[in-house]
Design a protein with these regions (language model features):
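Extracytoplasmic/secretory soluble proteins
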Residues: 1-321
Length: 321
């Protein structure tokens, strides 16, 4: 139904502060939501901007000053538990039970699995509802297709072939980069090794690993405790000592320096989010590469890492987000 008197609620929305991005509280999507809620339910929605990368601190400050939005979003469940212990948020379980019949779209989208994912098994309390993980593609391996073509190499399909490509990039730095040969980075990585080398590392997990083992250690989306995982780290150490990995990766905790190297055309390959070279439109890695190095320059996704059964396994996250 529609309220006879206009109601007002505040709702958190992430601000990623992307260069050239729109204000998340007044974007076209924000206007669509606000106008739709007002027209259909007579609810005035006020969006509150919270920094995506500073969300925990921002929410703590808003809660401390009494200005926290009515509806908050966070990836930090410990923060939710802290708020619950301070009586800063309400138990949703009674409301979910009472109003379930009025929320068919919510149940159709999330189902009991997501809605009750965080339910306290002892008290029955529900302090947060898990969103749907709409995109599960996760991570891909990317390599400079134009460099492969220039060196007469095929797209790598195995770890050995990928390794050989990195060696070729290193050994032909002057041909590929000319005066910038000293800036050659055959394979780039960050301090988040568990994410940025995941496909290589989990390829060392035996095919006969039990479902029990995957469940027990599956809480960690970096898979650090999966069986044989350390063998992937051994490979990375070998590559580093061979001069194939960005030697200064451990000095930087944000992505800007590494992204700039990719945009400038100094990086031959990397593992990252499934669409990483192509996101951010005209400021994407791919767009910058083609502008600086010609239409043929750019990265292409490849699958190179098979397990002991010759199968490419990608251990994806649960359907919560």
């Amino acid at each position: 139904g529609k309220f006879t008197e206009t109601r007002h609620i505040t709702v958190e929305v992430y601000n990623r502060y992307n260069d050239g991005g729109s204000d998340p509280t007044s974007s076209v999507y924000a206007q669509y939501i606000k106008q739709g809620m007002l027209d259909k339910y007579n609810v005035d929605v006020e969006l509150v901007s919270v920094g995506r990368w500073t969300e925990v601190d921002d929410l703590n400050n808003l809660l401390a000053t009494g200005d926290a939005p009515d509806v908050c979003v966070t990836y930090s469940y410990p923060t939710i538990q802290t708020f619950a212990g301070m009586d800063g948020i309400i138990d949703l379980n009674p409301l979910l039970t009472e109003y379930k019949d009025l929320l068919p779209d919510l149940w159709a989208l999330l189902g009991d699995y997501n809605i009750y994912y965080d339910q306290d098994p002892e008290t029955g309390s529900v302090w947060a509802i898990e969103a749907v993980l709409a995109e599960s593609a996760r991570i891909n391996t990317f390599i400079r297709k134009d460099w492969l073509d220039k060196l007469g190499l095929k797209l790598p399909t195995t770890e050995e072939e990928f390794h050989n490509c990195l060696i070729a990039f290193r050994d032909n730095a002057e041909l590929l980069l000319g005066a910038d040969a000293a800036k050659m980075v055959p394979f780039s990585i960050s301090t988040d090794i568990g994410w940025r080398a995941d496909l290589l590392n989990v390829s060392k997990v035996p095919e006969d690993v039990s479902d029990e083992t995957l469940y027990v250690y599956g809480y960690d989306d970096r898979h650090l405790l999966y069986p044989n995982y350390k063998e992937g780290i051994r490979v990375l150490n070998q590559w580093y000592n061979e001069g194939l990995i960005w030697k200064d990766f451990a000095l930087y905790t944000d992505a800007s320096v590494e992204d700039d190297m990719m945009k400038s055309g100094f990086v031959g390959a990397f593992i990252h989010n499934w669409d990483y070279p192509y996101r951010n439109g005209e400021d994407s890695i791919q767009a910058n590469l083609t502008r600086a190095n010609g239409a043929d320059a750019g990265f292409i996704a490849v699958d190179c890492f098979q397990n002991d059964a010759g199968i490419t396994r990608k251990y994806l996250a649960d359907r919560i987000d």
